[in-house]
Curated annotation (Swiss-Prot):
Native organism: Hypocrea jecorina (strain ATCC 56765 / BCRC 32924 / NRRL 11460 / Rut C-30)
Coiled coil (UniProt feature): none
Superkingdom of origin organism: Eukaryota
Signal peptide span: none
A family per Pfam: adh_short_C2
Residues annotated for NADP(+) binding in this entry: 53, 107, 140, 174, 178, 206, 208
Name assigned to this protein: NADP-dependent mannitol dehydrogenase
Keywords: Carbohydrate metabolism, NADP, Oxidoreductase
Family: Belongs to the short-chain dehydrogenases/reductases (SDR) family.
Lineage summary: Eukaryota, Fungi, Dikarya, Ascomycota, Pezizomycotina
Molecular function as annotated in GO: L-xylulose reductase (NADPH) activity; mannitol 2-dehydrogenase (NADP+) activity; NADP binding; oxidoreductase activity, acting on NAD(P)H, oxygen as acceptor
Catalytic residues in the record: 159 (proton donor), 174 (proton acceptor), 178 (lowers pka of active site tyr)
Length: 266
């Protein structure tokens, strides 16, 4: 059955997330894309389930601040995204705690720090397992819930690295994983056409702290290849996340929104 047209007509009502439950994985950092996606959803009234892998204190601090500032319910969960059984346990627990999941933002991931030749086989396996297989695990677990309830929105954090091979860093495993995430979203959009929408967001260089270990010379080279001349701020992504989880995007599925300051136009 085709998914219905929303009953709301006003734009603010279409973007509203009041009464909805949104999951955001990888939202334990102080200035990352995950916490900004969660913040955007909280601003629009959503209750939230946010996850962490190792930074429990960071996730709990973020949850406390979101509840205090926006008056929404926020619960924190530890999840090993590379273990399907743990992901399934987590999704079932969220449904038990909140009664439903309306949208799932699969944002958690790992970065690569070596190329194919210089890196180990386990380095490759780790990035692919977390970034691609882990995202697929999230999709599989929440997809079953979406199918049962008859609606849902899955948003995958991909990367501009799924469109281009970044220079000069060697991160083939990451590029491959993120390209896979983009096509995963497109494929699931078709597979889930009767009960859920699936889209991806491909950020460019965003100041989240994850690249702080990169030397300044390399970072200057990155910026020189961005038409807008600067890195992005994580808050510049939250509007896209809110759009894709809300009824404002009710006819959007299989899309990939590139937010990279123009990097991939070169």
């Amino acid at each position: 059955m085709p998914q219905p047209v929303p009953t709301a007509n006003r734009l603010l009502d279409l973007f509203s997330l009041k009464g909805k439950v949104v999951v955001v994985t990888g939202a334990s950092g102080p200035r990352g894309m995950g916490i900004e996606a969660a913040r955007g959803c909280a601003e629009m009234g959503a209750d939230l389930a946010i996850t962490y892998s190792s930074r429990k204190e960071g996730a709990e601090k973020n949850a406390e601040e979101l509840t205090k500032e926006y008056g929404v319910k926020v619960k924190v969960y530890k999840v090993n995204q590379s273990d399907y059984n743990d992901v399934e346990r987590f999704v079932n627990q969220v449904v038990s705690d909140f009664g439903k999941i309306d949208a799932f933002i699969a944002n958690a991931g790992a970065t690569a720090n070596s190329g194919v030749v210089d890196g180990s086989a386990s380095d490759w396996d780790h990035v692919i397992q977390v970034d691609l297989s882990g995202t697929a695990y999230c999709a599989k677990a929440v997809g079953a819930h979406f199918k049962k309830q008859g609606h849902g929105s899955l948003v995958i954090t991909a990367s501009m690295s799924g469109h281009v091979a970044n220079y000069p860093q060697e991160q083939t495993s990451y590029n491959v994983a993120k390209a896979g995430c983009i096509h995963l979203a497109r494929s699931l959009a078709n597979e889930w056409r009767d009960f859920a929408r699936v889209n991806s967001i491909s950020p460019g260089y965003i100041d989240t702290g994850l690249s702080d270990f990169i030397d300044e010379k390399t970072q200057e080279l990155w910026r020189s290849m961005i038409p807008m001349g600067r890195n992005g701020d994580a808050k510049e992504l939250k509007g896209a996340y809110v759009y894709l989880v809300s009824d404002a995007s009710s006819y959007t599925t299989g899309a990939d929104i590139v937010i990279d300051g123009g990097y991939t136009t070169r």
